[in-house]
Amino acid sequence: MNKIILTDSTNPQKEIIHHASTILSNGGLVIIPTETVYGVACDPNNNKAIKRLQKTKGREKNKPISCLCSSIDQVKKMCINWNKSIELLCKKYWPGPLTLVLETDNGWIGFRLPKHKIPIELCNRFGDLLALSSANFSGGTDSISADQTSSLDVDLILDGGLSSDRPIPSTVIKIDKNKIERIREGCITFKEIEDYFYNGLQD
């Protein structure tokens, strides 16, 4: 198959998803669309793949990489401080452009359940979480089309068309017990999340 493959964003072709999943299983890098911007995905449990992703983007090694999930249960099993507030926040904003940084046995990890068929189907086919970082050189403008990512050294690009009208990433917040902290403001304002989180949702 070609490096750039047109992929139906509403009903992704099974053979393309299978091909992308195989590449990920072999330690490769695959660029995929989300409902916000395009991202570079790899196997989060493959250290060589993570290092290659960092090198490809020129990303600092100590900068954390978030993970995509295909269900709330995947995250619930990993989070060691899961509570009712986190669950209600997930149910309100997922799937959607919100990344939650939660504590796990492996440290603090960002999780996101995207509102886009391609990453969801790929996660399901891969059978695990996917490490994902924005498909651009570190510090550069986020990409909203496959063409904008073509200079990155990856194994496959799934072209699902324009991901959004503007290159605005997901909002990132950290939840520590019953407190939230803004890491990055994106599609959803921190004030909206803060108001919802503290509006009678605590255990």
Features from the language model and the residues they span:
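Active-site-adjacent structural elements in enzyme catalytic cores
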Residues: 1-203
